[in-house]
Amino acid sequence: NRPNNKVSVMGNPTLGEVKTIMIGVRNNARATKSVEVWANELRLQEYSNDGGWAAQGTLNIQFSDLGSVNLTGHMETAGFGGIEDKVSERNQEDMYNYSITTSFELGKLLPEKVRFTAPIYYSFNKEVIKPKYNPLDTDMLLEDALDACTTEHEKDSLRSLTTTETTNKNFSLSNVKFNIATPKHPMPYDPANFSFSYSHSESNKTGETTAWETEKNWNGAFNYNYSPEYKPFEPFKKMIKSKSKWWDIIRDQNFNYLPQNISFNANILRNYYEYQERDIENLEDPTSLPLSFSKEFLWNRDFSLKWDLTKNLHFSFNSATHAEIEEPNVPVNKDLYADQYQVWKDSVWHSIKGFGTPLDYQQDFTASYKVPLEKIPCFSWMSLDGN
């Protein structure tokens, strides 16, 4: 009966977070009164039913046998969703994503007689998510909040705070080598025995509660592999003329004066992670909260030797060293901590010169011998071996 009466709510609540409403009735009179209170259903009307749209495109370019380039793009706007999705299940943000992927064989740029191979790979991906409503005031459109900013600095700060950006980069060179070897008899110094690989990946993310989150990985590998080709030395083959099988055990003896394979691998791996949480109450200083970081710097080396001294006598030796490149426990951020970065750099170089600090060392040696009983007629039905 009193339509002009108003009920006010103190503060600036977010309607989307209202879970409970309590109604209280107070009797200020001294007399006892009996009342009946009706609370009708409370609901929001005229729900926004604005639709959105999405698009996706792909472009693939092939450069003969040199390589290829692939471009992709994808975007969705607020309000986009499936046909069967409810209004509340549709997108509440604009999403933009694009990527580029390239793969080339650099060896194709050189004459074929050089016999150089260098497969190179690079990829870049970026995703931007822009909410429809201001996360700091979820009843207000973000565009309206940006229009309410009085300076460009305020607009840039609000965009940085409300927009989530994720960037990924990857680069790799795999098994780079010159496939040049000495004909018939490969030599230890042939370029084909050496190969090199390198990869680097980086991920960056910013958002409402994240000033920055960065992870970087490096991996460098060097490989040496030599397998000589030669005829074994058979000193008794021409010396014994008899064709009797009783002489086979001596006549067929041979000696390999070089090992069958020698290999050496060195692998350096480094990982660095850095996370800076955003201080909502102090946006002017992104480093007001403590910086979180973790890192790992390893240098792994292994050696392998396989030598069949004769047809029946086999040797193998393997060793592996896992070492850590020591570094001070400080953030590795040249822009924010220039002095600490120089200390870190000096410490790392000093550790590399000393081949790192060994964490563990493993080695094993195996030998096996098969008695050539098949060369003795009366024992050809038997076998005997040991290792």
Residue ranges and their predicted role:
Residues 1-32:
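Extracellular beta-strand ligand-recognition surfaces/modules
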